[in-house]
């Protein structure tokens, strides 16, 4: 994967347009979770320290396109940046016809979704963005799977288009895990439904040495082995697909599970052999034997790709499976990449952040990359690197 990297460019005096992911939760005009801003700060600081004229923008929420709506303004982000940086950060509302900036100055361009034509990647808007800059920096992996004016079109028209440090690190980590992985490669796919992760499972079954399934997905595989799954969430219409995947790839299926009679955080966990699951049982987690077997597989892996918890880890009585998998990943000496919202919540809950080699910032983009799909923003950067 060959792209121009921002860190290889001379930025002094240049007008630099950074497309970041500053789509943060806001309540009462205050940023309530700053993780995405913190992730973008090093890129912004590098540009400022290099003496660039810096513009940074993002989407925030889902406003009606083409209409200003204060509820979705980037103003709270600007307030946050003013506190975090040693410079005066301004918010520009009307910027499409040009901006005057000085070297070492930072301006936040208002929510790109206030501009008509953003989502449809319209050429006229893309060219207006491009006219603002000498260098376009794509640094929002979380939106790299969308071809929009601020993620794709601008890069096709800007004098130079490059990958920011965040995006470059993401592509490097995912490439290391998928393109030429140290083996054995173990992929862990959790979540509630096979249908939503089917293309991920099919893609990983072709490259993984072992594919670990968990959550509601695992129930469909248990059913595919002819076992009763009671009232558990599973997809009867995908049992044949599960059987096919088990032929194509080594998929260790649970031998024991944690059940309850109702979906309730106070429900007692009953550990059962899969052959003993009753019609009124609901499977909510892996049992201790299955967790131990999978933990051994993970500990011996050279590369680990993790997307999704293996049980209802939000409930104290059904967290043991995901806790065991998390510990195995933390203890493994292999290279590990984790991504997806629920996965990040599990990493936080079990305190293994420092032990995961790379944590992906992109939800949908992470999944599409793992599915083997071409991400439009990345394809654009590769094309521009050839020019």
From Swiss-Prot:
EC class name: transferase
Subcellular location(s) of the protein: Cytoplasm
GO cellular component, one term: cytosol
Keyword ATP-binding: yes
Reaction catalyzed: (2R)-3-phosphoglycerate + ATP = (2R)-3-phospho-glyceroyl phosphate + ADP
Family as reported in the entry's similarity comment: Belongs to the phosphoglycerate kinase family.
PANTHER family per record: PHOSPHOGLYCERATE KINASE, PHOSPHOGLYCERATE KINASE 1, CHLOROPLASTIC-RELATED
Name this protein carries in UniProt: Phosphoglycerate kinase
Species lineage: Bacteria, Pseudomonadati, Pseudomonadota, Gammaproteobacteria, Vibrionales
């Amino acid at each position: 994967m060959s792209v121009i990297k921002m860190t290889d460019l001379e930025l002094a005096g240049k007008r630099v347009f950074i497309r970041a992911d500053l789509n943060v939760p806001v309540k009462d005009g205050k940023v309530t979770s700053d993780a995405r801003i913190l992730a973008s700060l090093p890129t912004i600081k590098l540009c400022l320290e290099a003496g660039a004229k810096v513009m940074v923008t993002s989407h925030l929420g889902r406003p009606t396109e083409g209409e200003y709506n204060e509820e979705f303004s980037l103003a709270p982000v600007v307030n946050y940046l003013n506190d975090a940086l040693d410079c005066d950060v301004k918010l520009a509302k009307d910027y499409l016809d040009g901006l005057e900036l000085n070297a070492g100055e930072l301006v936040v361009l208002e929510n790109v979704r206030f501009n008509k034509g953003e989502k449809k990647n319209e050429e006229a808007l893309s060219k207006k963005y491009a006219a603002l800059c000498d260098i376009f920096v794509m640094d929002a992996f979380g939106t790299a799977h969308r071809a929009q004016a601020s993620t794709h079109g601008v890069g096709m028209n800007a004098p130079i288009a490059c990958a920011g440090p965040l995006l470059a690190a993401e592509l490097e980590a995912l490439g290391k895990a998928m393109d030429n992985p140290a083996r054995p490669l173990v992929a862990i796919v959790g979540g509630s439904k096979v249908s939503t992760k089917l293309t991920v499972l099919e893609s990983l079954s072709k490259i993984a040495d072992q594919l670990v399934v968990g959550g509601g997905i695992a129930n469909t595989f248990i059913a595919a082995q002819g076992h009763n799954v009671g009232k558990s969430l599973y997809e009867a219409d995908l049992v044949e697909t599960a059987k096919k995947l088990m032929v194509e790839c080594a998929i260790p299926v649970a031998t024991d599970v944690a059940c309850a009679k109702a979906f309730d955080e106070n429900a007692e966990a009953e550990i059962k052999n899969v052959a003993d699951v009753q019609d009124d049982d609901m499977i909510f987690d892996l049992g201790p034997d299955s967790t131990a077997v999978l933990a051994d597989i993970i500990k011996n892996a050279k590369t680990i790709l993790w997307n999704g918890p293996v049980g209802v880890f939000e409930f104290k009585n059904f967290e043991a499976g995901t806790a065991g998998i998390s510990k195995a990943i933390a203890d493994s000496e292999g290279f590990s990449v984790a991504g997806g919202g629920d996965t990040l919540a599990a990493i936080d809950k079990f305190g293994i952040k420092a032990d995961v080699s790379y944590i992906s910032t992109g939800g949908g983009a992470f999944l599409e990359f793992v599915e083997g799909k071409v991400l439009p923003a990345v394809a654009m950067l590769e094309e521009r690197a050839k020019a």
